[in-house]
């Protein structure tokens, strides 16, 4: 992309979830971030002011609904309403991390489908398009009646490992059956076979590794997942792979939620390196030496430009 974008009708705004990523995206596109402010009334209510005219403009709002999830979601909904009332031509939400995505179905009776509720709220507020990255459940796209561009970070993560020249004995590992499609995409790019961890989860945030489907003995394993939350799944998988004869274990994910005991578990695990993206802003206390972060700014910036110019974005899905 060029260093400067000349269409004055294109505007990019950032809320509070990931300002640093938003600045990187704006730089990739070649424009300055729009002027807005997010403040709070004395009772905690959110107040948003858009400090420039956006009448007739095509606006892109960068906001992940990561921790604090409800605060960030409410900021987004209020911002959408403000943009709609200020006569924006289109309101495009760029949500690198879609919170509540793991509540995509009724796992038990009398449970909500919160991922659908969030989609309803975003649409009802006035959004006209969504751009997002590696949703936990791809079928969430069907919860929206507006266009949604669902990008993935597989190419970015694959290129990282390809450039490290880890040898010919690579195996890409899915930590569960649900991640096989993602693992296969990476395996195809790295020209490597795949293995699958067969696990059972007795209760939320507790994972038990049961079996390894595939040959990992004498291999360098790369575990790929969409979200690492408490890191129970990924660290138990790494331990199981080493016990099965893997020589080294690397791990990567699109969304480093990293809650509770995650950092301690990763630090004490046999994982050589954990590679994550910056879809979620990480505070200093969530950094350890064996972590490395890759930026999705170029991918999201390219998507914004292509959408704005009515160009195809299909090559970004590959």
From Swiss-Prot:
Its EC number is 2.7.6.1. D-ribose 5-phosphate binds at residues 201, 225, 229-233. Involved in the biosynthesis of the central metabolite phospho-alpha-D-ribosyl-1-pyrophosphate (PRPP) via the transfer of pyrophosphoryl group from ATP to 1-hydroxyl of ribose-5-phosphate (Rib-5-P). Mg(2+) 1 binds at residue 136. Homohexamer. The active site is at residue 199. One of its GO terms (molecular function) is kinase activity. It is an enzyme of class 2 (transferase). Mg(2+) 2 binds at residue 176. ATP binds at residues 43-45, 102-103. Pathway: Metabolic intermediate biosynthesis; 5-phospho-alpha-D-ribose 1-diphosphate biosynthesis; 5-phospho-alpha-D-ribose 1-diphosphate from D-ribose 5-phosphate (route I): step 1/1. This is Ribose-phosphate pyrophosphokinase 1. Its cofactor is Mg(2+). PANTHER family: RIBOSE-PHOSPHATE DIPHOSPHOKINASE FAMILY MEMBER, RIBOSE-PHOSPHATE PYROPHOSPHOKINASE 1, CHLOROPLASTIC. Signal peptide: none annotated. Keywords: ATP-binding, Cytoplasm, Kinase, Magnesium, Metal-binding, Nucleotide biosynthesis, Nucleotide-binding, Transferase. Belongs to the ribose-phosphate pyrophosphokinase family. Class I subfamily. The keyword Transport does not apply. It is found in: Cytoplasm.
């Amino acid at each position: 992309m060029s260093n400067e974008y000349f269409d004055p009708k294109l505007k990019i705004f950032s809320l509070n979830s990931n300002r640093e990523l938003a600045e990187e995206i704006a730089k990739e596109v070649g424009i300055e971030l729009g002027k807005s402010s997010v403040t709070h009334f004395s009772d905690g209510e959110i107040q948003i002011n858009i400090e420039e005219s956006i009448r007739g403009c095509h606006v892109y709002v960068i906001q992940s609904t990561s921790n604090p999830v409800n605060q960030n979601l409410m900021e987004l909904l209020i911002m959408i309403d403000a943009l709609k009332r200020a006569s924006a031509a289109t309101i495009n939400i760029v949500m690198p991390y879609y919170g509540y995505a793991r509540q995509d179905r009724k796992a038990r009776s009398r449970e909500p489908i919160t991922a659908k509720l969030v989609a309803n709220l975003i649409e009802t507020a006035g959004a006209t398009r969504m751009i997002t990255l590696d949703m936990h459940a791809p079928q969430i796209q069907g919860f929206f009646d507006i266009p949604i561009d669902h990008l993935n970070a597989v190419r970015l993560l694959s290129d990282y490992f390809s450039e490290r020249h880890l040898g010919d004995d690579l195996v890409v590992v899915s930590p569960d059956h649900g991640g096989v499609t993602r693992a296969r995409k990476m395996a195809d790019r790295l020209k490597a076979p795949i293995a699958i961890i067969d696990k059972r989860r007795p209760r939320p945030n507790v994972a038990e590794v049961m079996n390894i489907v595939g040959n990992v003995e004498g291999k360098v394993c790369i575990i790929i997942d969409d979200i690492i939350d408490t890191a129970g799944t990924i660290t138990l998988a790494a331990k199981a792979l080493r016990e099965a004869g893997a020589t080294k274990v690397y791990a990567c994910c699109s969304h480093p939620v990293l809650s509770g005991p995650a950092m301690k578990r990763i630090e004490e695990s046999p994982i050589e390196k954990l590679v994550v993206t910056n879809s979620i802003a990480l505070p200093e206390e969530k950094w350890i030496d064996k972590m490395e972060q890759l930026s999705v700014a170029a991918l999201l910036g390219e998507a914004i430009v292509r959408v704005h110019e009515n160009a195809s974005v299909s090559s970004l899905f590959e």
